[in-house]
Structures are given as C-alpha cells and as structure tokens.
Amino acid sequence: MSISVMANSHLNQPYASASPTPQEKGRTCRYAGQAVRALPIRVITVGKKRSEGVRLLVDEYKIKLKPYCSFEDSLVRSNPRNAQDVRAQVEDEEVAMMKLIGSDDWVVVLDERGRDIDSEQMAELLGDAGNSGASRISFCIGGAYGHGTQVRKRANVTIRLSSMVLNHQIALVVLMEQLYRSWTILKGQNYHH
C-alpha cells in the first residue's frame, strides 16, 4: 500500500492514499503484534435520539473496547436551530461538531465518498493515528446532509464504511464493531479471520 502525506492546517500525518491493490488483498496489518499507542477514541455522531437497540449495541462495544482504549461517544443534535435551509442546517451541525474536535485530534471523517478500506487498513489507521503524536482520534459521522466544509478540511483522512449511504445509527454500529475488530487485529487475537 502506498503511503503519502496529507497536509493539514496543524498536523502533517501519514495515511493510506489509495484503495488496496489486488496484491494487497488478504494481507495482514503491518502493526499486528506490535506495540501501538492506544489513543482515546471519540465518536461524534450527528443525529437524533438513538433507538434502544442501537444504544444496547453501542454499550456492548464500549465494554469490548475498554481493555484496548478509552472511548467517548458524543451525539450532536441534528438541525439544532430547526433551520429550514439545508445549508444552514449543515452549518449549524458543523459548528457543534467542530466544538468537540480538539486542536490536536487525529480526525477521521466518515463519508460515502471517502476511501474504501478493509478491516486491516482500519487497524493500520488506528496504528498510524497512535504514532502521529495526536492526543485523541475523533471519528465524525455526519447528519442526513453530510458534513460541512470545515469538518471536511479538518479531516486527516476520509473513509467510507460502505458504498451505500447508511443511516447514522447504522453507521455508528458498524464503526463500533470495526473499532473492536481493529484492536483484535492489532493485538493478534482470535476474532478477525
């Protein structure tokens, strides 16, 4: 996999720049079995009150992640000022999201136009973030109309969980499982086959 550097206003961090080549499919994570600095993880989701089923699944994965890293789940209310204009709604959500992103966070934006990565690459993303000098990794899940310009510009990397558009609650559950899977890959544990 080729590694390139993406310039950010305050961080200059490596990230995988392209989808895996056919030769890279089926490979293992380059950090597997190595010591990786465990950054605290914050997931910032734009949305409304979560369903009971989603809350239960998120809580289950919070417990599973505890041995690996600290975890914080933040919910930004969608359309906080009840804007009638879509652009105003996205801007309002963006302001709230940006308040939760620290100046030295390593930011991953989830977007259907983002880079397609596999589970090993997600584990490598956690390893890259841990080696970056950042104090935390923040994953950002946008609202119904996506992310604003500031959030996109702030991203160290933009990935997608699927080629399909996912409801923010489904995206959160998929992300939680992938974070757990990534840590088991990094630790060489029997979960990912």
From Swiss-Prot:
Keywords linked to the UniProt accession: Methyltransferase, S-adenosyl-L-methionine, Transferase
Keyword rRNA processing carried by entry: no
InterPro entries assigned to the protein according to its UniProt record, in alphabetical order: Alpha/beta_knot_MTases, RlmH-like, tRNA_m1G_MTases_N
Residue sites binding S-adenosyl-L-methionine per the record: L110, G142, L161, S162, S163, M164, V165, L166
Broad class of enzyme this protein falls into: transferase
Keyword S-adenosyl-L-methionine: yes
Alphabetized GO MF terms: methyltransferase activity
EC code: 2.1.1.-
Biological process (GO), any one: rRNA processing
Family per similarity comment: Belongs to the RNA methyltransferase RlmH family.
Protein name listed in UniProt: Putative RNA methyltransferase At5g10620
